[in-house]
C-alpha cells in the first residue's frame, strides 16, 4: 500500500499493533491470522456497545472488512457485557407477538401495578372517556340542531331580500336596455333636441364658431376624410359622423363652386384681353 494510507491509518488509530493491515498477497489462513482475536480485545477501550452492536473496527476473524454474516455471534456480542450501555435482548423476528423482546418488562416504569390491575384501570379510564365523549357528542348535536334552526330562520329573509334585489336588477336592466347608450358626440348642447322644424322637416344643424373653425382647418389640409379621422373629429367636437360627413360634402361643393366661378372669371378676363 501507499505510504499515505499507512500514515493516515496509523494516525487515526494510535494502537498500530492492534490493527494489522490486510495483506492481499497471502493465503486465507495468513489473512485470518493477521487479525486479532475478538476475545483478547477490550470492548471498553476500542469501541462502545450500544444495544448489543459492536462499533469497533476489525473485530471479526473473517476475510471481510466488516465481518461475515455467519459470525454474527462474535460481532454483535461482547465477551465482557456492560450493563451500563445495553440490556441482553433476545428478539425473535418470526414470532407474531406484539412484544417479542424478553426485556419488555424493563421498558415500563418500575414499581407499577400488575398487568391485571393495569388492564382494569385502563378499561375504567376508557369507559369514563367514552361516557364523556358521548355527553360531548350529545351537547354538540343539540347545539348543531339549534344552529341549523337559527340558520334556517335567518336564511328565509335573506332569500326574500335576494329575490327582491334580483327583481330590481332585472327591472333596471330592462330599463337600461330600452334607453339607448349615450356617447359624447351625441350630446348636442348648442341645438334643440327635437330635430323637427316648424314644418315637420329636419332642423338645420347650427354649428358653433369653434366647431366651424376646427372643421375649416381640417378641410384646409384634407378635403376628404377617412373613417378613423372622422370618428376622432366627431368625438372631439361632440358631433355625429353623419353631421361631419354632410358638412364636408357641402364644403366640397362650395369649394368646387368657388373654383368654377374663379376659373370662369379668369377665363372671361383672359378672353377680354385677347386682341
Swiss-Prot record:
GO cellular component, one term: nucleus
Organism: Danio rerio (Zebrafish)
Function recorded in the entry: Sequence-specific transcription factor which is part of a developmental regulatory system that provides cells with specific positional identities on the anterior-posterior axis.
Biased composition (Polar residues): 113-133, 151-164
Record region (Disordered): 70-181
GO-annotated biological processes: anterior/posterior pattern specification; brain development; cell fate specification; regulation of transcription by RNA polymerase II
Low complexity biased stretches: 165-175
Motif (Antp-type hexapeptide): 182-187
Keyword entries, A-Z: Developmental protein, DNA-binding, Homeobox, Nucleus, Transcription, Transcription regulation
Gene3D superfamilies linked: Homeodomain-like
Gene: hoxb5a
Localisation: Nucleus
Top-rank taxon: Eukaryota
Record-given protein name: Homeobox protein Hox-B5a
Family classification: Belongs to the Antp homeobox family.
Principal subcellular localization: nucleus
Gene Ontology MF terms: DNA-binding transcription factor activity, RNA polymerase II-specific; RNA polymerase II cis-regulatory region sequence-specific DNA binding
Classification via SMART domains: HOX (SM00389)
CDD domains (alphabetical): homeodomain
